[in-house]
Amino acid sequence: MDSRYDQLSPVPPLTAITKNLIILCVAVYFIDFILTHLGVQIQGYYLKELLGLVPSLVKEKGWVWQFATYIFMHGHHLHLLLNMLILWYFGSEIELKLGRKQFLFYFLLCGIGAGLFNYSVNLLFSDVNRLSHPIIGASGAIFGILAAYGIFFAERYFLVFFVFPMKAKYFVLLMALVELVTGVESNASDNIAHFAHIGGMFVGAIYIYLRYIQPKGPKSGQSKRDIEREKLKKQFTLIVNDKGQKEEKGPYWN
C-alpha cells in the first residue's frame, strides 16, 4: 500500500467551540427560513438583509455589525450542510491546536476580515446593483481555517474527493488559486463571494504567521544581556558525574 495512506488525516472529534458554532449556524438558518416563509420583516427588512452583509446598507446606513453577523447566515440547506461539514472536519483540528478561546477569536477574525475584503472589492469593482445583494455564509471564516490547516499540517495527506491523496499545503494553495481565477472570471455571475474566500485565507495566513510561525522578538523592556541570558538558558544542561552528583555543564554567566 502507498505509504501516503499511512499519513492520511484522521477524522477529528467534534470539539466544543466548533460544535457550538455549528449549532448557532443551524439555529440561525432555521429561524431565517421560518421568518422568511412567513413574510416577517423587521423595520421593513428581512433577516438576511439585517444580518447578511449588504454593502449598500453598510455604506449608507453604517450597519457595521453585518461584518460579523453575515458569518452565521446561510441561504440554502446544501450551503449550510457543506459549510458545517468542512467546519467540523478542519475546524476541530485547528481548535485542538490553538485552544478554545484562540480558535473562536481566529474564526471571527477570518470571517470579519473576509467580509471587509469582499466589501472593498465590491465597492471598487462591482456595479451598483451588486452592492444591494447580501453576502452570507461562514465560508470566508472556513477558508481562513483551511489556511491554518495548510500551515500547521502542511505535510499531512488527505483524500481529495475521497479518491486522490494530496498534501494539505498543496490542497490549500490549489483552493486559493481556484478561488482567485474563478473570482476574476465569474464577475459574480455564479453568486459566490470568491473574494470573501480569498480574504479569509489571506487574513488567516497572515495572522497565523505573525502569531505562531514568525520567531518571537524580544519582550518589552528586555536588555540585550537579558536576551543573551535566555538564549544561554535554553542551551544549559545538567549531567551526573562519576560520583553520582549533579554537575552543571554548559555556558556560564554572572
Segments predicted by a language model, with ranges:
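N-terminal TM1-TM2 helical hairpin plus the immediately adjacent luminal interfacial "cap"
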Residues: 14-135, 181-205, 209
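Membrane-cytosol interface at the C-terminal ends of transmembrane alpha helices
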Residues: 84-91, 144-148, 175-178
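C-terminal transmembrane module of polytopic alpha-helical membrane proteins
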Residues: 1-17, 24-26, 179-254
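Membrane-interface micro-motifs in multi-pass membrane enzymes
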Residues: 131-152, 168, 196
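Cytoplasmic-side transmembrane-helix entry/capping segments in multi-pass membrane proteins
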Residues: 102-109, 137-139, 163-170
